[in-house]
């Protein structure tokens, strides 16, 4: 029986490349001179440090630009509020969301069931397996999921006949 998996996985090598590019831009930009702006990774968190709340927000925007250029969705990142630190520093905590949480998985299953397609969806630890009798039904299910505006970035893998 044909099937495929729906997952939400972050490519950490692309994130590292985007961090390097953003760090380079932050070190070269005039408005960040003397502001000690930097980006650090502590999986599953990313920290952005700078002197001043506005500089932290600007550094986050630079990082977002670099992520989008490398085709990494910003839906993986949840930014907190800039927190003041010692000596006028500020830091911003970015929480990385990988996998499909239970709420979004149920929304996808409901979306598939409401579409009246002859496919079944099963939730399995951060991913979904969708099975059907015909390959065409599975392709329609993929199109249906892509058309929905979900708050998570999805990939479709392991398409099997």
Go through each PLM region and give its residues.
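Helix-adjacent hinge/juxtasegments
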Residues: 56-97
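Short, hydrophobic beta-strand segments
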Residues: 2-9, 44-49, 87-96
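A structural signal for short hydrophobic beta-strand segments in well-ordered beta-sheet cores
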Residues: 38-39, 121
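An alpha-helical, amphipathic repeat domain used for nucleic-acid recognition
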Residues: 13, 40-43, 53, 159
């Amino acid at each position: 029986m044909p099937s495929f998996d729906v997952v939400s996985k972050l490519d950490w090598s692309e994130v590292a490349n985007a961090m390097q590019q953003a760090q380079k831009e932050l070190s070269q930009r005039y408005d960040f001179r003397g502001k000690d702006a930097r980006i650090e990774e502590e999986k599953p968190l990313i920290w952005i440090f700078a002197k001043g709340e506005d500089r932290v927000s600007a550094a986050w925007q630079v990082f977002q630009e670099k992520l989008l250029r490398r085709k990494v969705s910003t839906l993986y990142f949840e930014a907190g509020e800039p927190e003041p630190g010692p000596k006028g520093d500020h830091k911003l905590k970015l929480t990385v969301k990988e996998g499909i949480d239970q709420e979004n998985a149920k929304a996808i299953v409901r979306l598939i069931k409401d579409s009246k397609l002859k496919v079944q969806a099963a939730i399995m630890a951060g991913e979904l397996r969708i099975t059907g009798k015909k390959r065409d039904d599975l392709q329609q299910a993929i199109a249906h999921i892509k058309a929905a505006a979900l708050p998570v970035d999805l990939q479709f893998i392991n398409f099997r006949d």
